[in-house]
Amino acid sequence: MTLETPVRVLIVDDSAVVRQMLTEILSRDAGIEVVGSAADPLLAREKIKRLNPDVITLDVEMPRMDGLVFLENLMRLRPTPVVMISSLTERGADTTLQALSLGAVDFVSKPKIDVARGLEGYAEEIVSKVKMAAKAKVSALHRPSAPKVTLDMQSAPMPGSALRFRTTDRLVAIGASAGGTEALRVVLEHMPADAPAVVMTQHLPASFSTAFAERLNRHSAMSVREATDGEAILPGHAYLPPGGQHLRIIRDGARWRCRIDDGPPVNRHKPAVDVLFRSVAANAGANAVGAILTGMGDDGARGLLEMLQAGAPTLVQDEASSVVWGMPGAAYKLGAAQEVVPLDRVAERLLALSAQAR
């Protein structure tokens, strides 16, 4: 596919209304061509072979074959960028997170009632995510995992007890978007139980945050949770903003606390990475480390620059391992990143930089 060629899209959804609405929404954009639609995965399988789409939109719950089973088979046999169409329910959130772990690039929320009007309200998001998916590197989601990071007392750069992170004076701040649900899992999976405290912002719908925190917690030696307003930030813990709210940090004497912020969207996002990073720059300065992982757009780039200017070491995920090198690329181009690191080394570098932080 070249830049001049429209993105070829196949729509897979058991609802005729949804198929029609998605066709209308996507066809309005000159850069997209809807080449076909299918009511279930079995029909879709034949159309994929015949139509060779660049992107597939896929409903999660469908007859004849579960959407997750279809997605898993697709990624194994014919990796293709997929944007999931998912319901804004707790069950839908968990299923969508499973889909992202299987290789879906991103998802769009589908309302349970008044679907036609609801999808129209997401038209801009649907178009932008389909176009982004066409450029995404599906293979980046299936890179082999590195072995879990352990602190080697002999090879680490600092002596003695400085390697143990049982203090409150180190903080890691991470931001991510498209592809980030899996990237964050990989990073946290390789952080030890006594790692410095981690504060994170991942672009997600409000109803997804609890399921996402629980999913990360199952994969990490750290304790991963949704932050509550005013709670102390502790080593060995990782904090996400609760649904649809910004996460900031504040200084309280010798420690930091979480501040939940219900202010307006920033960079069209709520939660926004820039909100978190700017608060970290102001309240933690050189005692923090900042990282931007895979994601679309430029949220977090300016905040990461503020962290760097405040004395914090900074890094971004490299393009080769990113599903979308939008946010990391924007930070790099802005001069906000001191290091560009493959995903399987991000945890290792965060630990090393935390040990060196002033």
Curated annotation (Swiss-Prot):
One of its GO terms (cellular component) is cytoplasm. The modification 4-aspartylphosphate is found at residue 59. It is found in: Cytoplasm. The active site is at residues 177, 203, 299. Its main location: cytoplasm. Involved in chemotaxis. Part of a chemotaxis signal transduction system that modulates chemotaxis in response to various stimuli. Catalyzes the demethylation of specific methylglutamate residues introduced into the chemoreceptors (methyl-accepting chemotaxis proteins or MCP) by CheR. Also mediates the irreversible deamidation of specific glutamine residues to glutamic acid. This is Protein-glutamate methylesterase/protein-glutamine glutaminase 2. It comes from Xanthomonas oryzae pv. oryzae (strain KACC10331 / KXO85).
